[in-house]
């Protein structure tokens, strides 16, 4: 459960991400594909090379979903319901992949905003991404 301080930290961190969200989403996906090659199996139709338009487009989708989650941090289950259905019933993504992408997002954010990535912000973002992952996997059951 996100505390009021966590919510404040997440909103402040995401505000700093701003217009770079799509780029950071794509970078996190690239990082995930390189670090955890098994995740590529969900994207057999993608050009997974560095700078790929398909990876950039999907990175923007990831970033847009996270922006939506930040905007609706008090009601993420409703805000992410359609996305949860998509990943659980149509795409059938292994839930562990959300944790892997979350880790890669944290690394990406830390690389781009080292001064802002304090232990408290890191912990808040980690809790937030874990909450998003929980919501996205809630319909697997």
Swiss-Prot record:
Superkingdom: Eukaryota
InterPro entries: Globin (IPR000971), Globin-like_sf (IPR009050), Globin/Proto (IPR012292), Hemoglobin_a-typ (IPR002338), Hemoglobin_oxygen_transport (IPR050056), Hemoglobin_pi (IPR002339)
Domain Globin: 1-141
Chain sites annotated for binding O2: 58
Pfam families, alphabetized: Globin
Matches recorded under CDD domains: Hb-alpha-like (cd08927)
Modified residues (Phosphoserine): 3, 35, 49, 102, 124, 131, 138
Keyword Heme: yes
Sites of N6-succinyllysine modification: 7, 11, 16, 40
GO function term, MF aspect, one: iron ion binding
A GO term from the CC aspect: haptoglobin-hemoglobin complex
Tissue: Red blood cells.
A Gene Ontology biological process term: hydrogen peroxide catabolic process
Binding site residues for heme b: 87
Modified residues (Phosphothreonine): 8, 108, 134, 137
Keyword line: Acetylation, Heme, Iron, Metal-binding, Oxygen transport, Phosphoprotein, Transport
Cysteines paired by S-S bonds: none
Modified residues (Phosphotyrosine): 24
Modified residues (N6-acetyllysine): 16
Function: Involved in oxygen transport from the lung to the various peripheral tissues.
Similarity section: Belongs to the globin family.
Subunit structure: Heterotetramer of two alpha chains and two beta chains.
Protein name: Hemoglobin subunit alpha
The organism of origin for this protein: Nycticebus coucang
Origin organism lineage: Eukaryota, Metazoa, Chordata, Craniata, Vertebrata
């Amino acid at each position: 459960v996100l505390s009021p301080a966590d919510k404040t930290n997440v909103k402040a961190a995401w505000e700093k991400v701003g217009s770079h969200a799509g780029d950071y989403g794509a970078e996190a996906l690239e990082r995930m594909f390189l670090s955890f090659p098994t995740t590529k199996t969900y994207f057999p139709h993608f050009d997974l090379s560095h700078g790929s338009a398909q990876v950039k487009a999907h990175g923007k989708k990831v970033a847009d979903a996270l922006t939506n989650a930040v905007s609706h941090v008090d009601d993420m289950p409703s805000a992410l319901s359609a996305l949860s259905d998509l990943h659980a019933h149509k795409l059938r993504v292994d839930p562990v992949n959300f944790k892997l992408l979350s880790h890669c997002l944290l690394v990406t954010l830390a690389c781009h905003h080292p001064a802002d990535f304090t232990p408290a912000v890191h912990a808040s973002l980690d809790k937030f991404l874990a909450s998003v992952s929980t919501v996205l996997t809630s319909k697997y059951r």
